């Protein structure tokens, strides 16, 4: 079963588990799955949990790009990056993703939590699903292009939050 979360959410006991398949099997397995994470959700037939996992991941990447835009707009106007990150990570947009990955724009982790390759794989799957299901995914498509740019800049082994660096370079800030 796919999970949503990170090393931190696992340590905090807040991992979310999505399960697809037969309902009877889910009902029997749920107590064991709750040892992995407290939020265990039956989502439907086989494969449906994977669809939701991809939906979660595309939302993470799109949020990271939007957060990056906000930080860089503030920074280019003269507000320090640190102040922008502090305000945004404690504002109405402060989702768990923003709270955990927002500080990455100040210092990337030594080891990627979810690297560019892994995120781009899910973005491409989402875009293909969108085409198949006639669901336009415009922000997913744009965010995917930033992941492609990260690959071109040699940042592929970095956490996908490195899309901030891509946008920063395009904005005349950074390396």
Q: What residue ranges belong to the model's regions?
A:
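Rossmann-fold dinucleotide-binding core
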Residues: 1-58
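Helical "substrate-binding/catalytic lid" subdomain
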Residues: 48-171
């Amino acid at each position: 079963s796919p999970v949503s979360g990170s090393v931190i959410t696992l340590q905090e006991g807040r991992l979310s588990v999505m399960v697809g398949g037969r309902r009877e099997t889910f009902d029997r397995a749920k107590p064991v799955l709750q040892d992995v994470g407290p939020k265990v959700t039956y989502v439907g037939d086989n494969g449906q949990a994977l669809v939701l996992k991809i939906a979660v991941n595309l939302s993470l990447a799109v949020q990271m790009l939007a957060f990056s835009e906000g930080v860089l707009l503030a920074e280019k106007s003269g507000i320090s990056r640190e102040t922008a990150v502090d305000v945004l990570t404690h504002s109405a947009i402060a989702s768990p993703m923003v709270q955990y990955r927002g500080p990455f724009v100040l210092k990337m982790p030594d080891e990627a939590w979810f690297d560019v390759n892994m995120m781009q794989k899910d973005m491409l799957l989402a875009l293909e699903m969108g085409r198949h299901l006639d669901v336009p995914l415009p922000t997913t498509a744009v965010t995917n292009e930033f992941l492609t740019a990260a690959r071109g800049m040699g940042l592929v082994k970095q956490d996908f939050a490195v899309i901030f660096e891509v946008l920063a370079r395009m904005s005349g800030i950074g390396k």
